[in-house]
Amino acid sequence: MSVGTPLGDGEEVSFSRDYFVEMDVRSEEAYELASEWFDEVVFTKKLVLDGPPDWGELKDELRFLRERYEKVALLLVTNRPGLIKEVKKRNLRALLYVQGGDMRVNRLAIENGVDALISPWLGRKDPGFDHTLAGMAARRGVAIGFSLAPLLSAGPYERVQILRFMTKTWQLVDKYGVPRFITSSAETRWEVRGPGDLMSLGRNIGMDAPRARASLNFYPRRLLKKV
C-alpha cells in the first residue's frame, strides 16, 4: 500500500508501508548486510577534522563512493564549528551529516542548514537540543538522526540516560515538525539492525507506530531527493 504525501509547492513523495531506508552505515560489510534488509541504504563516509581537508582528495573519494554505493553521505566530526560552513559551501554532491555532542557544533550545524544532525546528545549530560534549536531545524529542514549505535556500547546507567535524552529530543522534534530518521549508524556488520529493531527503538522513545515507520520511510526518502 502506498499513498502520496504532500510536501508543499505541489511536491509529493510516495509513502509505501513496506519500503524502508537505512540512512547511515559506515563500512562495506555493514552496507552489504543492511542492503539485505532495507530497500535503500546510504553509505556514510566519516570525516574527522581539526582543520580544512584536502578538498580535491575528498571530492575524488566521494566520487569513488558514489560510483560504488550510489547514495553517499559525509559525516563531519569536529570540535571546530567554523569548519561546518567550510564543508557546506563545497559542492561535494553528498548528504552532509554532522556528529552532534558539542553544543556549539549542534547550533552551527543547524544554522548552516546541513542535511542532518546525528545524536545531538552524544557524550552530554543533557539532550543538546532545545526549543530554539528545534524551531530552527524545522525552518531550515535539518533532520535529526536518532542513532542506535551509542546504545549498543553503553553501560546500563548510561543507556538509561541516552534513552531519556532521545525521548526529550523526540518530543521537541514531534512538536515542531522537525525532519527525522532512525538509523543504526553501524560501523560493523554486528551493529546493523533491521527495520523492526529500529522501529522498536522509535517506540521506546515515544513514537507511535506510524511515526516510527515514517522515520524509516517518508522522511528518509524526502531527504534522499536532495542527492
Where are the model-predicted features located?
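N-terminal glycine-rich "phosphate-gripper" loop used for MgATP/nucleotide binding
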Residues: 99
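Charged catalytic cores and adjacent phosphate/nucleic-acid-binding surfaces used
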Residues: 1-43, 49-67, 82-85, 91-95, ...
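A glycine-rich, hydrophobic loop/mini-helix early in the fold
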Residues: 71-84, 102
